[in-house]
Each structure stands twice: as C-alpha cells, then as structure tokens.
Curated annotation (Swiss-Prot):
This is Coproporphyrin III ferrochelatase. Fe(2+) binds at residues 211, 305. Keywords: Cytoplasm, Heme biosynthesis, Iron, Lyase, Metal-binding, Porphyrin biosynthesis. Its EC number is 4.99.1.9. It is an enzyme of class 4 (lyase). It catalyses: Fe-coproporphyrin III + 2 H(+) = coproporphyrin III + Fe(2+). Involved in coproporphyrin-dependent heme b biosynthesis. Catalyzes the insertion of ferrous iron into coproporphyrin III to form Fe-coproporphyrin III. It is found in: Cytoplasm. InterPro entries: Ferrochelatase, Ferrochelatase_AS, Ferrochelatase_C, Ferrochelatase_N. NCBIfam families: PRK00035.2-1. It comes from the Bacteria. Transmembrane segments: none annotated.
Amino acid sequence: MIRRSAVSRVVAEGSAIASDSGFALGASQYDAVVLLSFGGPEGPEDVVPFLKKVTSGRGVPDERLYEVAEHYNHFSGISPINDCNRRLRGALEKELFSRGIRIPVLWANRNWQPQLEEVLREAYDRGFRAFLTLFTSAYSCYSSCRQYREDIAHAVERAGLSGRIIVDKLRQFFDHPGFVLPFIEGIQDCLEQVKERGFKVSRTAILFSTHSIPELDAAFSGPEDAHFGKYGAYVSQHKAVVEVIMSRLRVTDPDLQNYQLVYQSRSGDPSTPWLEPDINDAIRVLRGCEAVLIVPLGFISDHMEVLWDLDNESMQTARECGLFAIRTPTPGTHPLYISGMVDLIVERLEGVPRSARPAMTDLGPWFDVCQPGCCKNSRSGFKPAYGGVAP
C-alpha cells in the first residue's frame, strides 16, 4: 500500500500538486532510501559505451571522448565513483540502523549499472512502494538536480511502475553542516601541513573547485522566479558556501585573503560558453604565492574528476608554476557527512519544519519540492520529472 503524508507528493510533472512553499508538510513513511548517482564503467570494455551514453546529443568531439577514455584506462577502466558509492551506501545504512531506523539503502545510477529502473523494479517486486532519493550532488542546476528528476520519471515509466510507486527526493544539501564542516576541517588540516613545510599562510591561495557547466544552464539554475544574478543559484550557492568557510578560517588565520571559486572538467561543444576561470588557468595567473590549496567543493567523493582532473592535471600545473600544492579531502564517508545525510532523511520521516532545519548560508535550507521551471534544460526543453510541483 502506498502511504502518503499531509502533502500530496508529485509523482510526475502534471500529475499532482505539492506544497506551495516548496517544503513537505508533515511526516512521511518510506520503504527504502535510494542513493542515486551518476554511474561509471566497471571495466575497460565499459568505458567507451559509457562515455557515448553520457555525452549523447551534447556535441562532444570524438577526440575529447577518447581523451577522457584514457583517464579511465589509467584506473584499469574502472570508475572510482562505484566503490565510493558502495562505501557511502553502507555507511548511510549503518547510521540509519544505529538510530533504530530500519530502512534499507539501495544504490542506483543514472548512466550505468545498477540502472535505476532495474533497482526500482526489483524493489517493487520485494514489496517496496515508497522511495526517498538522495542525489550525490549538493548544488542546484540542471545536471545536478533536474536531470536526476527527469531520469527518475523515465526510469519509473520504463519499469512499468507509473502510478504504482512514490519517489520523493531530499533537498539539495550545499549548505548543510554535514557537508560544509568536513571541508572546513580538511582545509584546516592542510593549512597546518602548509605551515609545517615553511610556507606562509599570507602567500597561500585557496582555490575552491567545482564542475563547470554551460553559462546558460547556470543562468537557469534554481527557481524560475528567483533573482540570483547572471549565473543563477548554482554559482550563488557555491559563493555563499565559500564565504561561510572563509569566515570560519579567518578566525584563526586572519592572513588568509587569497581565495576564489574556480571551475573544472568542462566538456561539450567547444563553442558553448562555460563557467570560468578554469582551475588550471587560475593557477597559472597566481601572483605572490608560494602554495596553493585545492578544495573540491563541488564534489562529495573522490571520483574521476577529483582523482584525475585535480590530483593529476591541476597538481601538474602547480608544479610547473613552482607552487607547492595540496588537495583537501572530499566528504566521502566522513562521520559528519554521513550523520548529516541521515539527518536529511530524518527531516522527511519526522516532518521537521523548515525553521528547525540546519543551514549555514542565508540561501538555505533548500526546497524539498522543486518549482515549475526550476533548473530547466536550456537545450532540449521540457521533460516530465519527479519531485516537483506540477506546472
């Protein structure tokens, strides 16, 4: 039996109306949590098919595709994101069980095995009817939220489960303490290493790196009627978190003044404007610095964009510029991060009101339910999506 809370859930665009406030009203019951991620190849034979699936219709040149394939081949064709998600799934379930919450955590991907439609179908056959999804992306934009929601709608339809199950989503957690505090801790630890090596904090640059996206996607990120500036909620959320982190760091290190938000891992049509500056360009123009501290602020785990684009390419750029470089850890399975993500789940299970939800910036806490037009696709137009208010 499908169990509903005080708010009517949106099971697809156009099928139901949710809370006008964007926040779920009242407690909800779920049969499982779904950790929903991007996916990645599990062996050399998977690499090119995976990349072609991911880049289909995006105008990515073949030479770029095969360049990225070589990155995976350095890891024997296995994406590190898979083991990261296996560990994350296990840690989340363990934390839930430790709190007496007997809800299983399932792992599913948008672009590779285990495919979401298969996971939902198998869960349905086990008697599960209500699902709460946790996306492995903290911020708001098409590729990190709306596309997940569209893929849920597509997976439910392909699984033949339309109208039979409920799939809700957790809020974006960019400013939740469980996500932000591990970064602060990691930066503080790395700054100690910088000092131990004899470098001055006043001559250390901190580069907060996140995934670049097309400028138009950035402009459309967030609620349609919000006013976040030229690059939308995506950039505003990142900048707000950066300022919170820096304000904490300068309490003990007031000489920390050189920092900026940078971007990485762009792809797609080379003629399409993407967010800049690229991290490598930013490193090359640093002046008066001895060291650079790289913070992967846009990522929750050590997947390919972190291990290759940062640990390989950006570190090499720093060496070429004569700079000492160090990268902070991603949240991964940090206890604060795991506890924070379970707190998000509890918010929905217990119906925690917005006023009682933690957020470290003035932008949060973010919405449970997306509004019409939120993070719309600038290229392919409207598609049905779960977890949003019907237009």
